[in-house]
Amino acid sequence: MSFTVYPALDIRNGRVVRLLQGDYARETQYGDDVLPRAQAFADAGAQWMHLVDLDAAKAGGYTLAGTLGEIARATGLRVQTGGGVRSREDVARILDAGAARVVIGSLAVRNSEMVVGWLQEFGADRLTIALDTRQDANGIWQLPVHGWTETADATLDQLAVRYAQSGLQHLLCTDIARDGMLSGPNMALYAHLRALTPQLQVQVSGGARNLADVAAAKAAGCAGIVLGKALLEGHLHLEEALAC
């Protein structure tokens, strides 16, 4: 299995931002130079990037179609993108706008039956399921929903197995406790997922801070790693991560 580094840009109100643990009240802004940053990813040698519409993630209705198309045309990057995907029409529109792969988050928890149908319709290589998880006091990986204020009926393990058995290829998993914290990914979580669903291509997300974290993700047999804050704040250089 090849290993892919996904430099990431989260967009809110036209600006590149990062949220601490997904909290919209704890936002850091990095400017509105979205296309130049994407071009810099390509210039560094990246093949892919990860693009998140934070406005849509909150309110629904993907808003970055124009930006997505511009990035894809200008840079040649393959873009994995999502935020606010609520319907089949959303998926089709984002793919038509130039996405290589559409990320489906909360809907994948709320309505797995519908999303499994999309895997068959659009092709498993065109969709990534993104699951945000938090470990409870009993060590069970739960799936917080509705702005992380409630917990889904299904656990991470149950949903990962269900999707793996339904033909899913790409799973992006974020440990909420690590997101934006530069504290290192929770590699125990990813080792657990790899053992539970070895057929899935698991992407590491949340907490990456240095080359050792990239190397650890690769050594664990994960398919890729999403790099956000560490790149934006210069803790990690993309060229080095790509060469890792």
From Swiss-Prot:
One of its GO terms (molecular function) is 1-(5-phosphoribosyl)-5-[(5-phosphoribosylamino)methylideneamino]imidazole-4-carboxamide isomerase activity. GO terms for cellular component: cytoplasm. It holds the Pfam family His_biosynth. InterPro entries: Aldolase_TIM, His_biosynth, HisA_bact_arch, Isoase_HisA-like, Isoase_HisA-like_bact, RibuloseP-bd_barrel. Pathway: Amino-acid biosynthesis; L-histidine biosynthesis; L-histidine from 5-phospho-alpha-D-ribose 1-diphosphate: step 4/9. Its EC number is 5.3.1.16. GO terms for biological process: L-histidine biosynthetic process; L-tryptophan biosynthetic process. SUPFAM superfamilies: Ribulose-phoshate binding barrel (SSF51366). Its main location: cytoplasm. It is found in: Cytoplasm. The active site is at 10 (proton acceptor), 132 (proton donor). It catalyses: 1-(5-phospho-beta-D-ribosyl)-5-[(5-phospho-beta-D-ribosylamino)methylideneamino]imidazole-4-carboxamide = 5-[(5-phospho-1-deoxy-D-ribulos-1-ylimino)methylamino]-1-(5-phospho-beta-D-ribosyl)imidazole-4-carboxamide. Keywords: Amino-acid biosynthesis, Cytoplasm, Histidine biosynthesis, Isomerase. It is an enzyme of class 5 (isomerase). Belongs to the HisA/HisF family. PANTHER family: 1-(5-PHOSPHORIBOSYL)-5-[(5-PHOSPHORIBOSYLAMINO)METHYLIDENEAMINO] IMIDAZOLE-4-CARBOXAMIDE ISOMERASE (PTHR43090:SF2). This is 1-(5-phosphoribosyl)-5-[(5-phosphoribosylamino)methylideneamino] imidazole-4-carboxamide isomerase. The gene is hisA.
